[in-house]
């Protein structure tokens, strides 16, 4: 998970609980502070970036996203990834079934949406966004 073990899931905890904790830790860090977020949606790998090993990108580079709202930013990035066609010969391109979600298709045990939904629930931000292309 984290090379410094700052965020660790207990062996009996689900990814859902870990995702909720990540949203809560994010809120604690950002609370009452000015913040702006930038995401480079490039080289989207089938596994989390935190893995010491990975595979080829699963979709073409999507672009750069920015927002004052980290929840809206994550939602916009995930939506953009899910609108992409799979790169042939990638883990997504070779997946046997399509779950309608490029991130879950390559890693079915990860429920990325739970972090976004929990972030919205605790007041970190909103899943609603307006995409402005430049």
Where are these regions (language model features)?
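Extended, low-polarity segments enriched in aliphatic/aromatic residues
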Residues: 1-134
